[in-house]
């Protein structure tokens, strides 16, 4: 009985040793796992701190530093306002781009006709293209005579003697289209011509000053006395002096500049929309004025 009990005790001890031997590596493995978890946590915190450093970055040069403004002799309210500068955090807003780059669709099209004007001469001499020769498409060439007139008009060099090309047509009766084209081009040249500028050698009033309304006394006088007409018995020079005196145009020894100002004033009155409307109203009023004159009521209309 004693031997059997001792054998049973030994077997139990062996079983306990096996259990402990099986449990010891598991404990070691768990300890290693704990160490690995600690390392992972530390690496994650390091990476987070690195990301924060990258986001915030180093302080920019010239940025706001609260230490620079601590010594200012200001009240507590102003110092409180300075604290709002450091508290403010700007918001990142993604702006939508209105213009986006894109590649346009390929659209085949017929190009311009190549007139071969860029081809150099075979002898190698310069052709002065663009200086002496105008680079134009071959489909619509300009008339050299009209072009020289345009250049002369734009440069305002009318007194320079130069060789001008004179265009002539053979059998003009059979080519009316060329004549119409010439008339149209010359008419366009005259339409685009700016008005002539005249510089007076003596002081002359402005056109706007001469177009001002007359005084009521003078208008009343004109209602009683009519203006002198060309049938008056006087010379042409005296008649010019009278008309210029009525219109407040000064007259000097040479009456050419006074006459130019007189005709310029007449042209301004003729082209004025205001006086055109007055003239049309006067024409429309003529029948009624006749009826009133027949009734015996006289009315005088003055336009200034």
UniProtKB/Swiss-Prot annotation:
UniProt main location, coarse: cytoplasm
Matching Pfam families: IFT46_B_C (PF12317)
Start-end of Polar residues biased regions: 286-304
InterPro entries on file: Intraflagellar_transp_cmplxB
Presence of keyword Phosphoprotein: yes
Domain of life the protein comes from: Eukaryota
Localization of this protein: Cytoplasm, Cytoskeleton, Cilium basal body; Cell projection, Cilium
GO biological process, alphabetically ordered: cilium assembly; intraciliary anterograde transport; intraciliary transport; protein stabilization; smoothened signaling pathway
Disordered: region residues: 1-67, 285-304
PTM-bearing positions, type Phosphothreonine: 286
Biased composition (Acidic residues): 1-13, 31-55
Record flagged with keyword Oxidoreductase: no
Cellular component per GO, a single term: motile cilium
Entry keywords, A to Z: Cell projection, Cilium, Cytoplasm, Cytoskeleton, Phosphoprotein
Function recorded in the entry: Forms part of a complex involved in intraflagellar transport (IFT), the bi-directional movement of particles required for the assembly, maintenance and functioning of primary cilia. May play a role in chondrocyte maturation and skeletogenesis.
Quaternary structure and partners: Component of the IFT complex B, at least composed of IFT20, IFT22, IFT25, IFT27, IFT46, IFT52, TRAF3IP1/IFT54, IFT57, IFT74, IFT80, IFT81, and IFT88. Interacts with IFT57, IFT88 and DAW1. Interacts with IFT56. Interacts with ARL13B. Interacts with TTC25. Interacts with IFT70B.
Family classification: Belongs to the IFT46 family.
Protein name: Intraflagellar transport protein 46 homolog
Phylogenetic placement of the source organism: Eukaryota, Metazoa, Chordata, Craniata, Vertebrata
